[in-house]
């Protein structure tokens, strides 16, 4: 039997979405643990790999880490992986105002999961991207920048969409679909 995978997060909403998206049929047991990992700088993949290695070292077993980016095309990818700090200082209204002088309001929501089987294993990266636009904040404000991100093809922001619908189109869903495929493929090789 496989060891449980420790999802390293202190964000209850991320854990809630992960559990809802993976569902009961996911072939591994997921437990969560809050660990203070260093806040890293770099590109999206570098950050996920470094976080994953440090988490595996601290947990001494299989870990899953997640890093989310919101990349404004007019700002050449900013705030990107630094969205947490931009949101903390600017709130959703400020994120929207960042693009005030730009015609291009397009953005990418990017979720990067890093999985590491243990201390000596190399991390695997699973990345999901959802295209959209930045709009004036709409909807509940209970999950980060969801009120300002409107996915392409929708007239509602992430915050306005029912969770069940958001969880079938989001950047997190897309990354977790790749993670699920990895473990299902691995299980077929074992069985």
Curated annotation (Swiss-Prot):
Pfam families: Ham1p_like. ITP binds at residues 9-14, 51, 67-68, 84, 143-146, 166, 171-172. GO terms for cellular component: cytoplasm. It is found in: Cytoplasm. One of its GO terms (biological process) is nucleotide metabolic process. Mg(2+) binds at residue 39. GO terms for molecular function: dITP diphosphatase activity; ITP diphosphatase activity; metal ion binding; nucleoside triphosphate diphosphatase activity; nucleotide binding; XTP diphosphatase activity. Its cofactor is Mg(2+); Mn(2+). Keywords: Cytoplasm, Hydrolase, Magnesium, Manganese, Metal-binding, Nucleotide metabolism, Nucleotide-binding. Binds 1 divalent metal cation per subunit; can use either Mg(2+) or Mn(2+). It catalyses: ITP + H2O = IMP + diphosphate + H(+); dITP + H2O = dIMP + diphosphate + H(+); XTP + H2O = XMP + diphosphate + H(+). The keyword Transmembrane helix does not apply. Its EC number is 3.6.1.66. Pyrophosphatase that hydrolyzes non-canonical purine nucleotides such as inosine triphosphate (ITP), deoxyinosine triphosphate (dITP) or xanthosine 5'-triphosphate (XTP) to their respective monophosphate derivatives. The enzyme does not distinguish between the deoxy- and ribose forms. Probably excludes non-canonical purines from RNA and DNA precursor pools, thus preventing their incorporation into RNA and DNA and avoiding chromosomal lesions. Belongs to the HAM1 NTPase family. Homodimer. This is Inosine triphosphate pyrophosphatase.
